[in-house]
């Protein structure tokens, strides 16, 4: 036997073909959600109140400070919140302290700050009773970015952007003449030197003193920057110029300009780099990284001892940098302090760190490297030192020193997870509240006011509510199956507020970048307009405190060159400095490399390199891909496009009645199911005392009893059936974190999205043409692919102007047969079988004494009775919604339920449908091999194997070669061997079974080595000419079921303006006969067909009613009238002032129907209802029917005369 046995959980053992030793377990897969929210509760709230408070009033007498906060007990628990359509949230109480500086009085008070949504253990929120997920957002990181463009003459232009987390952008750029300009917040250009002068370095000599005179761009800019107004100092003139750019047309003074610049860049409330922005700027401008590979133009010595560290002319390599690093970190090494003039924006001195280097393009020329000194990590605004050092980097870039940034590099894109997104929203609410507090401080009496009276929590509550309810990133959770659920929580979206938009995103942003390796899955992304903008976190990826994605690597010892088990998590820009060997590099037992050279990655290059240069090694072959992709066996043999479809379609698999985990898995099935949140996990170890379908009781080792309530037939967000089944038995000892009960799409603790049928690749009567699938009837009969779907329907009884609506069994014009399953209140009983159009909740609405509609006139004409003054507004089963009533919930204010204003009672009915697989359903394997069922063949007619076993599914062999997803064929063969041997196997991605191993498994199972078999025709018993590939493959039924899509319209709603039928299943619409279809009929000269399609069947309002009448009366169909859309066109032209008339063949004007003539035409639905409510009418002879109609016509005539 090749391979080794691995236990997954307690109940499943697989033969694993993995050859690479895993040194690191897959981390908790939904930690991205839970850890981020935990950070928000622990630190995020404090940080935010710290930013906003203390709030001082305008006079400075009152000051409101934040002390502490606490979350109270939630009002509803998770299940109650679901049931009551409420939020799972806890009241937030904040302790505030109000200080009166005049009297010295201090008041502390606990202020209620609204209900705050809590995250469930599964990483979701329950908002209005529905589970929602906050998707993490991928955005540009704050920091300083350099770019280069080439103009049409081939000259390079450089640009710099300083991007804060919030606040004004600062941009430097060179123009066509090579002069350096600055833009503040996307306004008009300003010379770069003017900004330096505004910072307090007024004279040309000051500027040259800082930057040196070796830069052409700077010298040209200084030439252009002349002193215009001699009455102002250079600093004041520069300040006024800046002000004019920012506020054009306003009177400019140096003071207002100073205040404006301070507010724009140096006020922490207006400008915030966030800790990540400060980190990125310090990293970009620090001399440690910038000195690498440059040649020194001065000798560097120890400031204390005078000992020489590096001689002039030394090329700075990694070794020299490691010697220099401790000195560069010192406050007194090569630093110069400049003091700005007294009339500058900021008066504090500026400390810069400067080192001279040779220009790479001209060694005679000496350039300066200016670092931003030692700015504290906690300083969240941009400092003058940043601005000057940033300008120096910009000038050096034009001399060939430094490098431009790649905006799509994951070192420059960061993740905003739940915690941060929530914090940003909360901060917006607090900022709005701050304004209110300031106003109230100045209005109210300072001696009597309390914190409670100052605070208005409305803006805060509104901001949080809006975020959870309607933000683009707060999404209704995909609950088709556990994999879809987990994938949704690990999704990374570049869309949303502060992100990209679909139309503006180019190809570069969407493309796979080399830094995605181990961080973002290159495969799993939607097809369509969002491709590449929505991604999935890789299996081992995690997010660090700055929001950058890190991936783990095994450290390689630099002296022994052996791979250790020490794990380092690296961000994308750290990884750029190292050479990383691939996970499949062969190792000896002691961790040394087998070969002297290995394939490795360095930056974006794949290189073959000697082992003494290797710094790190991949942790696992599956670290490249996400969990969904890692569940595809033989992924390495599939084309990437098909792998993408396979990964996406696994999320759409419907939970089946009795699912089976794949015979050929990848070994991640257990972890995926365990972390998805649908399995029941043991909280502590102990012994099982009691098990049934509803609960499991476990006696802990310390004697406590844990009770686990199982989820039973709950409707998921996607209308699927979520159900849990115990997999432990009484007396069994269990460990903490073990799976006690399977959720939907699980078996024995593993993910089980489909079944393992016997599949053959062969054609059958052309029925599997173009990806169609031929099924064995056994799959229908034995409920192999049967799923349960639950739909919910609501009916509300409201107060109307004419009186309250009433839930009742007394419904006008309904027979007893329709009421047989309703109780006294008109509510359906649980367990009743209902069909389309059946009443679920009987409800009547009072009718005002209005003029009779044509419908009622018709009823009067036939029955001559006064109709009751109520209308039937019962809740009925919609088309395709029939099934068994599974549950009924009644909500009334008397029971303490919170209902919307004006609602007296609400009834919610759940209908369960059992759907067997049928023609038209979509099915798929895990390799993007999808198809629709075209025919279900009796078992005895299906082709069968030599031992008499009929094949379950026939797939077309044409679907394999052109699509290059060969993984399905390998899975088929290995699955056949596994089935015969009665084992489960694991073939992990990029480390799975080889061809030889599959052949050995087939031989072990006593099967032919090529995996093919003779197959006999079930109808004739003859063998087919050629041997056929037969085997076992994991095959799923997808959520695209024909029941949800099939649709037919007889009579339905019409659009108000054009009077044409609406479109779409949801509106019970018709089929659009478009322009091209009209051409087709015209081409065949089918004039009458075309005419009726354009008139009676569409928008000839009078005509379609007359057709209905003539059909009922059995008369010939009258000639069509003028279509409504034509009338609309005429009216539009008349509205434009064109005199438009319609003439007939004789030249007489055709009268078009007037707007107010609608009443005189009987609505078709009135007639339909008449026929429905009085079926006996249709059985009477024509004369009686005709009489009824003529009576109606008379009535409408008299009505018109009135």
UniProtKB/Swiss-Prot annotation:
Enzyme class: transferase
Swiss-Prot/TrEMBL catalytic activity: RNA(n) + a ribonucleoside 5'-triphosphate = RNA(n+1) + diphosphate
GO CC list: DNA-directed RNA polymerase complex
The EC number(s) this enzyme carries: 2.7.7.6
Keyword Transferase among record annotations: yes
Domain of life: Bacteria
Biological process according to GO: DNA-templated transcription
Keyword check for Transferase: yes
InterPro entries according to UniProt: DNA-dir_RNA_pol_bsu_ext_1_sf, DNA-dir_RNA_pol_bsu_external_1, DNA-dir_RNA_pol_su2, DNA-dir_RNAP_su2_dom, DNA-dir_RNAP_su2_hyb_sf, RNA_pol_bsu_bac, RNA_pol_bsu_CS, RNA_pol_bsu_protrusion
Family: Belongs to the RNA polymerase beta chain family.
PANTHER family: DNA-DIRECTED RNA POLYMERASE I SUBUNIT 2 (PTHR20856)
Cited function: DNA-dependent RNA polymerase catalyzes the transcription of DNA into RNA using the four ribonucleoside triphosphates as substrates.
Protein name: DNA-directed RNA polymerase subunit beta
UniProt organism field: Leuconostoc mesenteroides subsp. mesenteroides (strain ATCC 8293 / DSM 20343 / BCRC 11652 / CCM 1803 / JCM 6124 / NCDO 523 / NBRC 100496 / NCIMB 8023 / NCTC 12954 / NRRL B-1118 / 37Y)
């Amino acid at each position: 036997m090749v391979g080794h046995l691995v236990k997954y959980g307690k109940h499943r053992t697989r033969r694993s073909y993995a050859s690479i030793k895993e040194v690191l377990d897959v981390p908790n897969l939904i930690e991205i959600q839970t850890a981020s929210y935990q950070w928000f509760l622990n630190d995020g709230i404090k940080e935010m109140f710290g930013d906003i408070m203390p709030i001082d009033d305008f006079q400075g007498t009152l000051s409101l400070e934040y002390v502490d906060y606490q979350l109270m007990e939630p009002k509803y628990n998770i299940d109650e919140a679901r049931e009551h359509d409420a939020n799972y949230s806890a009241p937030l109480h904040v302790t505030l302290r109000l200080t009166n500086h005049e009297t010295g009085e201090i008041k502390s008070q606990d202020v209620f700050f609204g209900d705050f949504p809590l995250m469930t253990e599964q990483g979701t929120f329950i908002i209005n009773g529905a589970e929602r997920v906050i998707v993490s957002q991928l955005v540009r990181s704050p920091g300083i970015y350099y770019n280069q463009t080439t103009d049409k003459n081939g000259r390079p232009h450089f640009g710099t952007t300083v991007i804060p987390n919030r606040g004004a952008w600062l941009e430097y750029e060179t123009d066509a003449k090579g002069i350096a300009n600055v833009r503040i917040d996307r306004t008009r250009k300003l010379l770069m030197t003017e900004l330096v002068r505004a910072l307090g370095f007024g004279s040309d000599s000051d500027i040259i003193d800082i930057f040196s005179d070796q830069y052409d761009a700077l010298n040209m800019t200084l030439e252009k920057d002349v002193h215009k107004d001699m009455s102002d100092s250079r600093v004041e003139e520069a300040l006024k110029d800046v002000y004019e750019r920012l506020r054009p047309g306003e009177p400019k003074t140096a003071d207002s300009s100073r205040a404006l610049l301070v507010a724009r860049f140096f006020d922490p409330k207006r400008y915030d780099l966030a800790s990540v922005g400060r980190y990125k700027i310090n990293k970009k401008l620090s001399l440690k990284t910038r000195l690498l590979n440059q040649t020194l133009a001065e000798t560097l010595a120890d400031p204390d001892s005078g000992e020489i560290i590096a001689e002039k002319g030394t090329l700075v390599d990694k070794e020299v940098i490691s010697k220099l690093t401790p000195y560069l970190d010192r406050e007194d090494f090569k630093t110069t302090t400049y003091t700005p003039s007294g009339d500058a924006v900021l008066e504090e001195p500026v400390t810069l760190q400067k080192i001279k280097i040779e220009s790479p393009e001209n060694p005679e020329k000496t350039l300066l490297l200016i670092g931003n000194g030692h700015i504290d990590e906690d300083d969240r605004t941009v400092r003058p030192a940043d601005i000057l050092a940033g300008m120096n980097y910009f000038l050096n870039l034009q001399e060939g020193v430094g490098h431009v940034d790649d905006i799509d590099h994951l070192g420059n894109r960061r993740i905003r997870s739940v915690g941060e997104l929530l914090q940003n929203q909360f901060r917006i609410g607090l900022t709005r509240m701050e304004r209110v507090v300031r106003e109230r401080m100045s209005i109210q009496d300072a001696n009597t006011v309390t914190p409670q009276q100052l605070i208005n929590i409305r803006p805060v509550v509104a901001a949080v509510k809006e975020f959870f309810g309607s933000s683009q990133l707060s999404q209704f959770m995909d609950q088709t199956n556990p994999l879809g659920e987990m994938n949704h929580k690990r999704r990374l979206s570049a869309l949303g507020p502060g992100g990209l938009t679909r139309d503006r995103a180019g190809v570069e942003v969407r493309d796979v970048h080399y830094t995605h390796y181990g961080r973002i899955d290159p495969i799993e992304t939607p097809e369509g307009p969002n491709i590449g903008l929505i991604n999935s976190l890789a299996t081992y990826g995690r997010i660090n405190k700055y929001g950058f994605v890190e991936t783990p690597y095994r450290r390689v010892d630099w002296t022994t060159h052996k791979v250790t088990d020490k794990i380092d998590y690296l961000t994308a820009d750290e990884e750029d400095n190292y050479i990383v060997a691939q996970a499949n590099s062969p190792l000896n037992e002691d961790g040394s490399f087998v070969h002297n050279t290995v394939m490795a990655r360095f930056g974006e290059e794949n290189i073959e390199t000697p082992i003494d240069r290797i710094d790190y090694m991949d942790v696992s072959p599956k670290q490249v891909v996400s969990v969904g992709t890692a569940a595809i066996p033989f992924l390495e043999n599939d084309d990437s496009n098909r792998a993408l479809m396979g990964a996406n379609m696994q999320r759409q698999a419907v939970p089946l009645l009795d699912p089976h985990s794949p015979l050929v898995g990848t070994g991640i099935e257990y972890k995926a199911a365990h972390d998805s949140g649908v399995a029941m996990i043991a909280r502590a170890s102990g012994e099982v005392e009691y098990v049934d379908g509803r609960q499991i009781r476990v006696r802990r080792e310390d004697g406590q009893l844990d009770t686990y309530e199982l989820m039973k037939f709950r409707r998921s967000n996607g209308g699927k059936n979520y159900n849990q089944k115990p997999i432990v038995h009484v007396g069994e000892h269990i460990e903490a974190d073990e799976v006690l009960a399977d959720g939907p799409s699980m078996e024995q603790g593993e993910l089980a999205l489909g079944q393992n049928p016997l599949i053959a690749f062969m054609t059958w009567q052309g029925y599997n043409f173009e990806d169609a699938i031929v099924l064995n009837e056994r799959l229908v009969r034995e409920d192999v692919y049967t799923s349960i779907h639950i739909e919910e329907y609501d009916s509300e009884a409201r107060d109307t102007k004419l009186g309250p609506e009433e839930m009742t069994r007394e419904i006008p014009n309904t027979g007893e047969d329709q009421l047989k399953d309703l109780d006294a209140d008109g509510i359906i009983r649980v367990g009743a079988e209902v069909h389309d159009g059946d009443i679920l909740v009987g409800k009547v609405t009072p009718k005002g004494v209005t003029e009779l509609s044509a419908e009622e006139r018709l009823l009067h004409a036939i029955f001559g009775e006064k109709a009751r003054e109520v209308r039937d507004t019962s809740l009925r089963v919609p088309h395709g919604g029939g099934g068994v009533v599974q549950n009924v919930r009644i909500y009334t204010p008397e029971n303490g339920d919170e209902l919307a204003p004006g609602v007296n009672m609400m009834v919610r009915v759940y209908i369960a449908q059992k759907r067997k697989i049928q023609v038209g359903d979509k099915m798929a394997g895990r390799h993007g091999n999808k198809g629709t069922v075209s025919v279900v063949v009796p078992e005895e007619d299906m082709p069968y194997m030599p031992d008499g076993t009929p094949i379950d599914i026939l797939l077309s062999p044409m679907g394999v070669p052109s699509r290059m997803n060969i993984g399905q064929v390998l899975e088929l063969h290995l699955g056949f061997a596994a089935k015969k041997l009665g084992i489960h196997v694991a073939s992990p991605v990029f480390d799975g079974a080889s061809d030889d191993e599959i052949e050995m498994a087939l031989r072990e199972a006593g099967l032919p080595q090529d995996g093919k078999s003779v197959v006999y025709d079930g109808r004739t018993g003859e063998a087919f000419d050629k041997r056929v590939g037969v085997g076992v493959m994991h095959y799923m039924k997808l959520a695209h079921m024909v029941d949800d899509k099939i649709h037919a319209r007889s009579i339905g709603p019409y659009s108000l303006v054009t009077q044409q039928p609406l479109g779409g299943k949801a509106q019970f619409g018709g089929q659009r006969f478009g322009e091209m279809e009209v051409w087709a009929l015209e081409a065949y000269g089918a004039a009458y067909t075309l005419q009726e399609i354009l008139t009676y069947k569409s928008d000839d309002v009078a005509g379609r009613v007359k057709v209905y009448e003539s059909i009922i009366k059995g008369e010939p169909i009258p000639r069509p009238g003028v279509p409504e859309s034509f009338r609309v066109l005429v009216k539009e032209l008349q509205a434009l002032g064109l005199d438009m008339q319609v003439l007939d063949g004789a030249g007489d004007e055709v009268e078009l129907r007037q707007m107010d003539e609608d009443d005189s035409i009987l609505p078709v639905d009135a007639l339909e209802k008449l026929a429905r409510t009085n079926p006996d009418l249709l059985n009477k002879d024509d004369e009686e029917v005709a009489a009824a109609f003529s009576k109606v016509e008379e009535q409408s005539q008299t009505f018109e005369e009135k």
